[in-house]
Amino acid sequence: ILVVSDGSTDATADIARAAGVAVLDLPLNLGVGGAMRAGFQYARRVGYEYACQLDADGQHDPREIETLIETASSEHADVVIGSRFAGKGSYHARGPRKWAMNLFSFILSRVCETRLSDTTSGFKLYGPRALSLFAHNYPAEYLGDTIGALVIAARSHLVVREVGVQMHPRAGGEPSHNPIKSALFLVQATMALAVSLSRPGEKVAPAPEENA
């Protein structure tokens, strides 16, 4: 387990260290993109085969990581999304947020050349080629860790897949959306998608060939 403390001013880093967890304590707040890039660089440096991103509010079950790894192996995928809408669990969205999610799933399914139902999921597994790409090319703007990262992966010819996961009730913190914020999310996310689609891809090492 790696905890990236993105310039936090609370006791997060101290509590994690006391529990015996590896900590990257960034001196400045770099935002989600910078913190994720630091985590990817750490994963490559210490030789991780996979890195898994999940939210800290208790909604994602770490026991589902094995499901994502199995999907990466069986589908030869570089990025695996843990989807809230792929037939496992009863999570659902409403209003403008749901409209935005449906729109992005429609567009990104075509960009990634696979059916995707949850493109804004914060539960993802990254394989070796994804780690190599994102260690130096990970978007820092709004929704870069979801929509932007998927566009970069697809444009760089990485294989993206998804698998259904169970979501749990939020264990802490406040929801980041309400009707007004959801409408704003629709506008901002559409702009973020347009920016992401305007970027070229990156060259990464080819995927290993399957055994005959």
Regions found by a protein language model. Name each.
Residues 114-115, 138-141, 150-168:
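Catalytic donor-sugar/metal-binding loop of nucleotide-sugar-dependent glycosyltransferases
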Residues 5-13, 58:
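A conserved acidic beta->alpha catalytic loop
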